[in-house]
Amino acid sequence: AATRVDENGLVNYAEIIGDSVLTGNNSNFDTGIGSWITYNGATLVHSTDKLEVTLTSGQSGARIDTNSLISGGQAGKTFKVRARIWQGTTTSTALKIFIGGAQENITISSTPTYFEFELTATNTGMLTIYRAVSGDTGTYFIDDVTAKEVTRDNVPRIDYTGGGCPHILAEPMRTNLIPYSEDLTEWNKGNLTIASNDIISPDGTQNADTLDVPDTNDFIYEGATTIASTEYVFSFYVKRGTIAESSLKLAVYDDTNNAFIVSDISYSASDSEWTRVTQSFTTPVGCILIRAYAFRNSSSTLGTFSVWGAQLEEGSYATSYIPNFGTALGVTRNQDIFTRDGIGSLINSTEGVLFLEIAALSDDGTNRILGMSNGGFNDSVLLRYDSGSNKITAQVRLGGAYECTLNYTVTDVLDYHKIAFKYKVNDFALWVDGFERDTEASGNVVSGLDELSLSVSSSNKFYGKIKQLQVYTTALTDTQLDALTS
């Protein structure tokens, strides 16, 4: 469920897409039909670089065993399935694409058309392209079929939010409590109408709904279960059509105590690009159910606007979008954990520099720690966002006690800062943005450093944006540290 903004400015998953398990005639039918076989009595023949399927009068089609082509089998794995399909003599237009218990409906025509879906297999069922109902005994054609495994676990999120150089995005665990984050037809609404999949969304596909507001007292909201006296953030992407910007207002309603938590909150929206709107609030005592309104306006207003990617999450700030396609209890994105161990040859325990260019996700009064260790927090070289507002701290911890603690308070931890922590026996220095900010002339260092981790402290893991992370095996000179952090 973890998304990021890619180099093209699109919101999508950080993933690795493998090669197609279908190759040669199993994919392109250049000289034959490969290993494709009949499903429920259909007739399959090779027809000039394509597969021709002659239907029976009932459910029928073509299929191929993909499970045997995949190391470890296909169950539990996600695939991008793509195929070009079109009518021959059949008048039927409704077909299905199936793999391992998952399927999607498609509508074909006489024009060769590509269909692409992401399907997660739950069993070994063959990849099947078929008509699921009775009909005529005509033909349809299949060509250019691919099935590529998609891997999202253990893939770092390289994020391009804001443009320019990317960063590694490390976020805490969050759950999107909005059950239908992209399908507004499932929301509760007033008199406004919804055009489904009307325009291109922030993920680059045509799956964003457009709302048409015809009169006064219109609204649209989704309900969610909450915990009383808890911080939440409601967010969504919006793009304005013909509606006046001044008419766009959101609200959050306490459905337990029958009162608004926030109401008539105006928000900005462009008519040329998507804007992410965020609203923080705290649930009142006893509140266990809320309504999150993406639009609520009692004034006389007309016009259109589009909404996509709604999210309600517990926390003090909004995190990256977590798609939810109908899970009432919410979809969870696990915390990002980065650890590299067994690198003792790359770290000098006697002296060195830990350098980062980082920005915080929030100045939220928590400790967020990363560092190098010999396998545990008690013996480590640390950099942290401190619980003090906008405070950066560097420390050496030996046997559970701190040998040195260096501090500097920046203007805003949400901005990127270049930070270098020099460590050496009786010689410690913290450099930030081209200046030496704090020093300590007494203290020992840790031996046997061999691990670099964003979760060196199990109770205070690091969350933030990382543009650069470097480890130097010598204590750099002041001139070098100046150049490195400037």
Predicted regions and their residues:
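Short carbohydrate-recognition loop motifs
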Residues: T43-S60, D198-D218
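Short tryptophan-centered beta-strand motifs in secreted/extracellular beta-sheet-rich domains
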Residues: F115-L119, F234, V277-F281, L414-V432
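Extracellular carbohydrate-recognition regions
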Residues: A1-G41, D143-D144, K148-N191, A310, ...
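Flexible glycan-contacting loops in extracellular carbohydrate-active proteins
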Residues: T122-M126, L289, T304, E440-K465
